[in-house]
Amino acid sequence: YARLSKSERLQRVLKLLKDRKWHSTRKIINQAHVCAVNSIAAELRMNGYAVECKRVGDVWRYRLGG
């Protein structure tokens, strides 16, 4: 997995999630310019961040917990 200190893509997503609000997969893709949000969430967890996810209808949402 990628280390946060060496991954701009993880840093961009973490910056977005730091407001602790729920963000849809689409919003994260568009605002952080990434893909595979579920993989990024897993990598952030491996870096010690409590990323939560939930499904609302057909939309997955993510936020920084803890």
For the regions a language model picked out, list residue spans one by one.
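Short, basic interhelical loop/turn and adjoining N-cap
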Residues: 34-39
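Residue-level marker of alpha-helix boundaries and capping positions
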Residues: 4, 31-32
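Short acidic, hydrophobic short linear motifs in intrinsically disordered regions
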Residues: 22-31
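Short amphipathic alpha-helical interface segments
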Residues: 7-22
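DNA-binding patch around the recognition helix
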Residues: 1-7, 41-66
